[in-house]
């Protein structure tokens, strides 16, 4: 530890103690908040089922930065590099298309054995795993419908895929000793004016009920459902709307997934957390950065990321909110994208933990909104960066932008050789 870092740390402890904050306790609390990193940033959502196939479902990964992972070995190596540069607890979020098999496997036939390498790797790196059925980039999703499909056979195929995915998810939780959160997102919707908006939603309701009919130990598996406003090619109607899934999660007591990019650009999920928590047992967050639409840009340490973190901490939702990331930028180094976004999420959580929330709540309750605003703004100037750097130091990860040198070296030695 450098003298400069030690001096900054001691000063930060004093400054935060002056406003009633124990920075050591804040760091202990930060270690209770894992962030689930998404595997699909590493290969632009290609997966291993058909890596040369096109990405469908109204989502896009734009850019052609060289060096993307082409197989599971490369993806795990890239993840290891990213994980080594991010302090504190992490998880990994997998999609079904990241299965490993010597022969083709239909999506309704996936089994735990197709993910045994991921489980062994997660054990070795002390990671929890989360999971997602992949209801896109497939011939039977080509017309834009899956679980809400009017064709009974196609709809049943996707039901069976989601049921098989739940068994994989439960296997993750059983093997790793931490519950896997399995999130269901489907692209189902229509491009133009839709006459019958009810029937697809009735089909989706019945399909989801069949999907979750098999009971699993909640210590191993947690169901989540995710809404969306629109997607490319489904601008006019989305079956799985916010109202649909809010009602479903509340009535079935599943987790509700809130994705930062899945609402109108003037809406923010930070404002939805406290409302949803009154009705659903758990929330899954997909922290992202929408630029004009659900563009899935890399997460910044911006106002909304901070507001999301503050909601979790202020209301002590540590055990009810699962923090995941969802972005995929193919225009920059993909390992750097993981590191930037995940470190930013953790920085936001730390800043929230360093807030004198009790004092601010008292000011608010007494009607002293002047002092509330003044202290909230002054809080931004306190030396949280020194606390962050100490956290990085204790977890043997680089402080500041030193991690970028490691990424550049890896790019030169490993990524540049991929063609």
Swiss-Prot record:
Q: What Pfam families does this protein map onto?
A: RhaA
UniProt cofactor(s) = Mn(2+)
UniProt GO MF annotations: L-rhamnose isomerase activity; manganese ion binding
Write the record's keywords in alphabetical order, separated by commas.
Answer: Cytoplasm, Isomerase, Manganese, Metal-binding, Rhamnose metabolism
What does the record's cofactor remark say about binding?
Binds 1 Mn(2+) ion per subunit.
Q: Does the keyword Isomerase apply?
A: yes
> Which positions make up the signal peptide?
none
Main localization of the protein described in the UniProt heading:
cytoplasm
- Gene Ontology terms describing biological process: L-lyxose metabolic process; rhamnose catabolic process
Q: Which HAMAP family match?
A: RhaA
The protein depicted here goes by the name L-rhamnose isomerase
Which lineage do the record's taxonomy fields give for this organism?
Answer: Bacteria, Pseudomonadati, Pseudomonadota, Gammaproteobacteria, Enterobacterales
């Amino acid at each position: 530890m450098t003298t400069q870092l030690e001096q900054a740390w001691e000063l930060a402890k004093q400054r935060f103690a002056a406003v009633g904050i124990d920075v050591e306790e804040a760091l202990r609390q930060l270690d209770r908040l894992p962030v689930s990193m998404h595997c699909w940033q590493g290969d632009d959502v290609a997966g291993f089922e058909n890596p040369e196939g096109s990405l469908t479902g109204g989502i896009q990964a734009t850019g052609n930065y060289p060096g993307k992972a082409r197989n599971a070995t490369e993806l795990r190596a890239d993840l290891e590099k990213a994980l080594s540069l991010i302090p504190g607890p992490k998880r990994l979020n997998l999609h079904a298309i990241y299965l490993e098999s010597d022969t083709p496997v239909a999506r309704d036939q996936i089994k735990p054995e197709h993910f045994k390498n991921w489980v062994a790797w997660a054990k070795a790196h002390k990671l929890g795993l989360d999971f997602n059925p992949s209801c896109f980039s497939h011939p039977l999703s080509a017309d834009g419908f899956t679980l809400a499909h009017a064709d009974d056979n196609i709809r049943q195929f996707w039901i069976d895929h989601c049921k098989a995915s739940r068994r994989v998810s439960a296997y993750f939780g059983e093997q790793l000793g931490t519950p896997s959160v399995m999130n269901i997102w489907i692209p189902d919707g229509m491009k133009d004016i839709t006459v019958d908006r009810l029937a697809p939603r009735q089909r989706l309701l019945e399909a989801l009920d069949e999907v979750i009919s098999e009971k699993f130990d909640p210590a191993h598996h947690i169901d989540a459902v995710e809404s969306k406003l629109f997607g490319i090619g489904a601008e006019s109607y989305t079956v799985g709307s916010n109202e649909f899934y809010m009602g479903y999660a509340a009535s079935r007591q599943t987790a509700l997934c809130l994705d930062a990019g899945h609402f109108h650009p003037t809406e923010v999920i930070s404002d939805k957390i406290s409302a949803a928590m009154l009705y659903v047992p758990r929330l899954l967050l997909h922290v992202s950065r929408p630029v004009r639409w659900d563009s899935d840009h890399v997460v910044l340490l911006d106002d909304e990321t901070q507001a999301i973190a503050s909601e979790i901490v202020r209301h002590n939702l540590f055990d009810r909110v699962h923090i995941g990331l969802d972005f995929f930028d193919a225009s920059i180094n993909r390992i750097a994208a993981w590191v930037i976004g995940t470190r930013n999420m953790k920085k936001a959580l730390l800043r929230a933990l360093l807030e004198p929330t009790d004092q601010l709540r008292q000011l608010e309750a007494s009607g002293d909104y002047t002092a509330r605003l003044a202290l909230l703004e002054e809080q931004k100037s306190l030396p949280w960066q020194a606390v962050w750097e100490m956290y990085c130091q204790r977890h043997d990860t680089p402080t500041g932008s030193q991690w970028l040198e490691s990424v550049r070296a890896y790019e030169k030695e490993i990524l540049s050789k991929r063609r």
